[in-house]
Amino acid sequence: KAVTEVALRFGRVVVIAPETTQSGMAHAVTMYSPLYLRTVEKRGDLTVYACSGTPVDCVKMGYDHIFAGERPALNISGINHGSNSAVSILYSGTMGAAIEASFYGAPSVGLSLTDHSPDADFEASALFAEKIISDMLTANINEPVCLNVNIPVGRPDQIRGYRVCRQNRGYWKEEFYCRKDPRGKDYFWLTGDFYNQEPDATDTDEWALANGYISVVPVQVDM
């Protein structure tokens, strides 16, 4: 909601959001069950829809059904609850939606706040998102540019600025906690830690975030 209110300062906004939490859905699409779409709110220049599918489903629903041939000036995905730096971009539903939107030829940005707390302050991060939105709209980009933007936790006066950088090399080292349900059957919870393979590199998103900068990573689809 915080970034929606910021975006409204620039013009008409259409929000298409998943009905349920979609963390880790990456670029998944719904193929073997129907999608449902409902109107949640209409208020001035704001229209909000809820979609039963994945973040990428929401983008496809927007471009191929709701927009009816229109191309938005900018696609915004997020603000995500938690970092999408380094290899996490490949697991991210937030970035899956941003990348999908760029396929349609319009600029897009995925926004994430490096805070998993239930009391995370999205209002502060929305202030920084406003500058990114303003800069991208002012640049009048006519290419499918996609940015992965991560905002570190902190008060506005603690953030040192924006840093254009590259994706850090690393991987998640997972563990599975095994427990038993009331019927004695095993079930598992996934957990793990991120292993940074280049902790001393100063040109990466992980370094930028650890040193109080907002990381801005241009994303390319051609891998």
Regions found by a protein language model. Give the residues of each.
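Short, glycine-/small-residue-rich phosphate/pyrophosphate-handling segment
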Residues: 109-135
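Glycine/threonine-rich flexible loop motifs
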Residues: 83-92
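C-terminal accessory domains and tails appended to enzymatic cores
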Residues: 142, 146, 152-223
